[in-house]
Amino acid sequence: MGVMINHHFLAFIFGILGNVISFLVFLAPVPTFYRIYKRKSTESFQSLPYQVSLFSCMLWLYYALIKKDAFLLITINSFGCVVETLYIAMFFAYATREKRISAMKLFIAMNVAFFSLILMVTHFVVKTPPLQVSVLGWICVAISVSVFAAPLMIVARVIKTKSVEYMPFTLSFFLTISAVMWFAYGLFLNDICIAIPNVVGFVLGLLQMVLYLVYRNSNEKPEKINSSEQQLKSIVVMSPLGVSEVHPVVTESVDPLSEAVHHEDLSKVTKVEEPSIENGKCYVEATRPETV
């Protein structure tokens, strides 16, 4: 009995630590969305990482609610649902019409339709509570592990370019620590569904830190990339319980005129005609493009 109490106490301690670190992880994109708010444009940012994170938080929150003894899992994923919803709402508000429609389609397909399907299957098809917990837990594991394609892509990019520009050591370190906290939480709760994704997260985080130490003094220049990638770099974020995100972070300032061409309606860009000479005088005419 004493061992069980000790295990629950340790689970509580690691759960608290996991909550603190994950709380900071969820707030990592705040500078991104402050930039979006100030510029009234989503620029080259995408909604996919935030929608995937919201979907993950919804699944883990549902899992924690039916499991009934995972309060610390409820707290962090409730916070995650609120924060990611705010991020997505701001993205909808400032995205172009085309990007907004695309993001809304993804939101309806993944966070409404797919989540509703999982909800109905686990609630109406699977009747017994223990089996519900087991089925939903393995669904969470499968989805959490599957999205590790993103950090693997960043690892491949670092090896290819021999540059750690896209993989800050500090972020990789704290995310690895987060994986350790949640792994220990799952271990002491004897919940393999919580522990497994964080084993993968720990291994990938450790790999990222090793690569950083190997390539941090490399003199290799990153290969040339397109203009949108020059403006932004991809930061891999392991969310609580093994879900990964790619948060774009500004790397350099963008020329206002080129930004207008890339992100704004063409009607906002004036067209300068070639100078003409008439009666010994030079004329330069600025005209707006014709609207259809």
Curated annotation (Swiss-Prot):
The record gives the membrane topology as: Multi-pass membrane protein
Q: Which InterPro entries match?
A: SWEET, SWEET_rpt
Which GO annotations describe the biological process of this protein?
A: cellular response to abscisic acid stimulus; cellular response to osmotic stress; cellular response to salicylic acid stimulus; embryo development ending in seed dormancy; leaf senescence; seed maturation; sucrose transport
Subcellular localization(s) per the UniProt record: Cell membrane; Golgi apparatus membrane
Which stretches face the Extracellular side?
A: 1-8, 67-70, 127-134, 190-193
GO molecular function term, any single one = sugar transmembrane transporter activity
Q: Which parts of the chain span the membrane according to its record?
A: 9-29, 46-66, 71-91, 106-126, 135-155, 169-189, 194-214
Q: Name one GO cellular component term.
A: plasma membrane
Intervals, Cytoplasmic compartment = 30-45, 92-105, 156-168, 215-292
The knockout outcome noted for this protein's gene is: Reduced sensitivity to high salinity. In plants lacking SWEET11, SWEET12 and SWEET15, severe seed defects, which include retarded embryo development, reduced seed weight, and reduced starch and lipid content, causing a wrinkled seed phenotype. Altered sucrose efflux involved in the transfer of sugars from seed coat to embryos thus leading to starch accumulation in the seed coat but not in the embryo.
Q: Where mainly located?
A: membrane
What the record says about the induction of its expression is: Induced by the pathogenic bacteria P.syringae pv. tomato and the fungal pathogen B.cinerea, as well as by salicylic acid (SA) and abscisic acid (ABA). Induced by osmotic stresses (e.g. cold, high salinity, drought, mannitol, and sorbitol) via an abscisic acid-dependent pathway. Highly induced during senescence. Triggered by NAC072/RD26 during senescence.
What keywords are annotated for this sequence in UniProt?
Cell membrane, Developmental protein, Golgi apparatus, Membrane, Repeat, Sugar transport, Transmembrane, Transmembrane helix, Transport
* Tissue expr: Accumulates in leaves during senescence, in a SA-independent manner. Expressed in the lateral roots and in flowers. Expressed in developing seeds.
Residue ranges of domain MtN3/slv in the record: 12-99, 135-219
Q: Which family does it belong to?
A: Belongs to the SWEET sugar transporter family.
Record's function text: Mediates both low-affinity uptake and efflux of sugar across the plasma membrane. Regulates cell viability under high salinity. Promotes senescence and sensitivity to salt stress. Contributes to seed filling by triggering sucrose efflux involved in the transfer of sugars from seed coat to embryos.
Quaternary structure, per UniProt, is: Forms heterooligomers with SWEET1, SWEET6, SWEET8, SWEET11 and SWEET17.
Record's protein name: Bidirectional sugar transporter SWEET15
